[in-house]
């Protein structure tokens, strides 16, 4: 059975008379390894050899080979005062001490760069970034130079060219800046339209720097466009129902305050009605199918060229209603495209005001006034200054009036006695 060798070879300690070849042979046969314990039991254990156990390393070389290693190593006279490390050269010690103190004397000389390094080779490697024109970080360094020049001269946002997608601004020379994190106000303002009246083209001053809309602002603007588009479709049936009046059109436009800022680059007044809806229609046709704005017209367009109060053809999106708001069932206006200039004197452009016959529709007629008698009227009696003269005369009804069925009198009026009593009561009350 093979014996498991331990980390410390005790057979070499117990048998110092063996040759060095046997000491270095670790791949002995099983017979030699089993014979070693028998020799250890026969020979006495010297006490001097047991004292050398503490000088041996577990996996290191043998004690005979350790005497030659210190002679080959160079002396390390430069020791670190803060730790136990020693170095062969002075510059190695100086570089090591800077790891404890944090000193970085090697600063980058490139304008606009505030990087500092504790080693000169790190500075040399960093300088290649600025010297290489194809490097991404070199392009960032050039943009860092442009930003201070733009802010110092005070150029307007409309005059500046659009920057790169991820331009960073260098930090002050006394502070360290990270190249992967850019401050929120380091972007140069970018104009969505060439006009200066765009609400997003104005500059914002924060900590003495001008900034424009960043990624979060673009996201909020896109969300606002979607909400305005939803509100536009919500108010569209209500607007189309009152589409024939200019007041309803302006009211519906006031209900959509956000569409005017996103669809048009110049401001519109409330009187500029045609231009507003014309640009909204053109913008809706340019939109993509997946965009919040639909390709249908945002509102029915009005034709101011025609003198008619109603258009000749109502849009398909509007509800079906009669052009003339009158209860005549058979009245229809002729379409304008069928009329010519030569027939304008013979054929009227519009139908007559009252073309309906009496048989088609009859308005509720008021009862005809009663035939006035030759006596004084009721207003003349009431207007008399003397109160004693304010007396109603007894009504006198002729026989022909009582017999006629279509005279216009109510049945209660035909009774002369009841009318007389009513007249007497009225005189007493006056």
From Swiss-Prot:
The record's InterPro entries line, in alphabetical order, gives: creA/MIG_C2H2-ZnF, Znf_C2H2_sf, Znf_C2H2_type
Q: Does the keyword Transit peptide apply?
A: no
Q: A Pfam family name for this chain? A: zf-C2H2
Annotated Gene Ontology MF terms?
Answer: RNA polymerase II cis-regulatory region sequence-specific DNA binding; zinc ion binding
**Coiled-coil ranges from the UniProt annotation:** none
Where are the residues of the annotated region Disordered? 1-77, 97-187, 265-340, 357-430
Predominant location: nucleus
Where is the signal peptide, in residue numbers? Answer: none
> What does the entry list under GO cellular component?
cytoplasm; nucleus
Task: Cite the entry's keywords alphabetically.
Answer: DNA-binding, Metal-binding, Nucleus, Repeat, Repressor, Transcription, Transcription regulation, Zinc, Zinc-finger
Functional note: Involved in carbon catabolite repression. Represses the transcription of a number of genes by binding to a GC-rich region in their promoter.
- Protein name (Swiss-Prot/TrEMBL): DNA-binding protein cre-1
Species per Swiss-Prot/TrEMBL record: Neurospora crassa (strain ATCC 24698 / 74-OR23-1A / CBS 708.71 / DSM 1257 / FGSC 987)
Lineage of source species = Eukaryota, Fungi, Dikarya, Ascomycota, Pezizomycotina
